[in-house]
């Protein structure tokens, strides 16, 4: 059975929302807590959380996830891949999950992993209406390309080179919604009140 790892990318300096982005609350639960709760741990051989925040490291420990310190949060979106992926180099596939999709459901992530197991040569991502979102699960053959990424080039760069290898699992649009600005978070809170 293929070994699958998960990298939760909780490392960004969140320039647009300030450093407390991951602590921002929606319905009484922080974005980082929601992100960790959305990880179907039983589907993975190992889960690592890449962050520079001690409180996130502590929270990762409560979930029995490994925490990896991100020494260069200013380096851009590729950087969590660099410390996260080597910790999972013995895996056959690795899923990359962001921490600013507060409505992402763990059931959807579990279904994504199950879909990948049926087509382990493919990159599998959540999507809606044919538009790709996160998370994405990459087979090991793409690890070298992921490790070559620099600065603000994330996994998207690799996917664009290999569109024919991409499979999308359709989920409701709300699950893919990211809150990377204070305004986006306030809009989401306002909608939740309706």
What label would you give each PLM region?
Residues 1-54:
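N-terminal glycine-rich phosphate-binding loop and ensuing alpha1 helix
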Residues 2, 144, 148-194:
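Conserved alpha/beta core of the MobA/IspD/sugar-nucleotide pyrophosphorylase nucleotidyltransferase superfamily
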Residues 7-11, 50, 97-98, 126-127, ...:
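Short beta-strand segments
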Residues 18-21, 26-30, 51, 71-79, ...:
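Residues at secondary-structure transition points
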Residues 22, 46, 66, 165-167, ...:
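Conserved beta-strand segments of alpha/beta enzyme cores
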Residues 33-93, 107:
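Conserved N-terminal catalytic core of the sugar/cofactor nucleotidyltransferase
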Residues 74-140, 144-147:
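Conserved beta-loop-beta/alpha segment of the NTase-like Rossmann-fold superfamily
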């Amino acid at each position: 059975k293929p070994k699958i790892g998960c990298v939760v990318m909780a490392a960004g300096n969140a320039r647009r929302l300030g450093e407390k982005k991951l602590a921002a609350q929606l319905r009484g639960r922080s974005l980082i807590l929601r992100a960790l709760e959305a990880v179907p741990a039983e589907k993975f051989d190992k889960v690592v959380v890449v962050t520079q925040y001690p409180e996130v490291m502590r929270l990762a420990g409560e979930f029995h996830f490994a925490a990896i310190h991100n020494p260069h949060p200013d380096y851009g979106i590729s950087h969590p891949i660099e410390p996260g992926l080597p910790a999972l180099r013995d895996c056959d596939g690795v899923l990359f999950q962001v921490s600013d999709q507060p409505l992402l459901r763990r059931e959807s992530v579990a279904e994504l992993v199950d879909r990948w197991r049926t087509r382990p040569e493919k990159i599998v991502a959540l999507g809606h209406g044919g538009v790709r979102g996160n998370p994405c699960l990459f087979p090991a053959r793409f690890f070298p390309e992921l490790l070559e990424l620099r600065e603000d080039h994330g996994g998207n760069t690799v996917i664009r080179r290999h569109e024919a290898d991409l499979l999308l699992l359709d989920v409701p649009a709300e699950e893919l919604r990211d809150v990377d600005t204070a305004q986006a978070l306030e809009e989401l809170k306002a909608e939740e009140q309706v």
